[in-house]
């Protein structure tokens, strides 16, 4: 995999729209640092798809340009598996809706970027 080149970045920005990406150093640092702060990752680009179609199109774009990615969900885990090591970060934070609650079967359908507290609140309601 390679670092994102200008053609990839232009296509990704067009795909995601102005709210769907960032190259701001503060935001990049935030997604590259696990919340425990045990160590520091790095990323050149933050992508925030708004839905599954954008996420799928972004993955295809990454594959076509040989750009590695690190997905991040709600970032409520303790294993730091979402820490990037030079890859772009694909943050699912814009995808956080509770899709359904099935009390009879004790199940929830929640989008990938929902933090654990969202699932807990939906289950309690």
Where are these regions (language model features)?
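Short beta->alpha junction loops/turns
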Residues: 51, 112-113
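N-terminal flexible segment immediately upstream of the FAD-binding catalytic core
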Residues: 1-64, 77-106, 121
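Glycine-rich beta-strand-to-loop/alpha-helix junction loops that act as flexible
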Residues: 72-76
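Hydrophobic, small-residue-rich alpha-helical packing segments that form membrane-like cores
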Residues: 103, 114-125
């Amino acid at each position: 995999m390679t670092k994102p080149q200008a053609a990839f970045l232009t296509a990704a920005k067009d795909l995601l729209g102005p709210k769907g990406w960032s190259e701001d150093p503060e935001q990049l640092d935030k997604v590259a640092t696990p919340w425990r702060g045990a160590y520091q990752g790095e990323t050149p680009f933050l992508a925030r798809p708004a839905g599954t179609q954008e996420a799928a199109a972004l993955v295809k774009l990454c594959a076509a340009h040989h750009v590695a990615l690190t997905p991040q969900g709600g970032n409520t885990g303790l294993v730091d598996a979402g820490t990037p090591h030079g890859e772009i970060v694909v943050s699912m934070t814009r995808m956080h809706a509770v899709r359904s609650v099935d009390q009879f079967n004790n199940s929830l359908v929640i989008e990938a970027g929902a933090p654990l507290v969202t699932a807990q609140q939906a289950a309690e309601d």
